[in-house]
Amino acid sequence: MTKTADLKGSNFTLSVLHLPNDDVALALSMLEQKVAQAPSFFASAPVVVNIENVSNEINFVELKSGVERTGMIPVGITGCKDKQKQAQATAAGFAVMTSFTPQQVTQKANMQPTKVVKTPIRSGQQIYAKDADLVILNHVSPGAEVIADGSIHIHGTLRGRAIAGASGQAEAKVFCKNLQAELISIAGNYWLSDQIDKEYWHQNVMITMVEDRIQIDTLTL
């Protein structure tokens, strides 16, 4: 029997660039700085632009080309009810996306056994625990990336990037013995190294999501 193409709805985690005003150049400058801090994380990553707080006209062509120059892929705009702006955004190549409150993923459906890695994770390496928790019994070097659909436990120093809840599980956590991360992320919410308070640097910590915000707590164990 011949199979045919099928079109289904799905949920994806997307980065959102929030514009505080119509100064596109300033927003793009900020985006370039963020991408420069973790280029492999943001490379070819889709991004949505939220223009809810912009009351003036926007140069959507400049906005789209500027985002593309950073290496990210602009897929659409959100926060816009103005039909004229929607038409301008569409003409520039943006999709117009409806804002919504995503349902939190609470079920750990089809979770697999925990993936355990005993060796150091070296620069340029990527480890992914699909539908599972991830345990690293060693260090994660700068430029390395560890990803899990569940939680991540690092029994060493985290100098690279840790991405937990990659499939959208907001209850996922990151544990590490020594926090020096380039980037930490849970369910699509991320902090770069400059957003991590220095009081948590070099500390044994637990990283969670609380009320849609990343929270870091030191552990005494």
From Swiss-Prot:
SUPFAM superfamilies: Cell-division inhibitor MinC, C-terminal domain (SSF63848). It holds the Pfam family MinC_C. One of its GO terms (biological process) is regulation of cell septum assembly. Interacts with MinD and FtsZ. HAMAP family: MinC. Cell division inhibitor that blocks the formation of polar Z ring septums. Rapidly oscillates between the poles of the cell to destabilize FtsZ filaments that have formed before they mature into polar Z rings. Prevents FtsZ polymerization. This is Probable septum site-determining protein MinC. It comes from Aliivibrio fischeri (strain ATCC 700601 / ES114). The lineage of its organism: Bacteria, Pseudomonadati, Pseudomonadota, Gammaproteobacteria, Vibrionales.
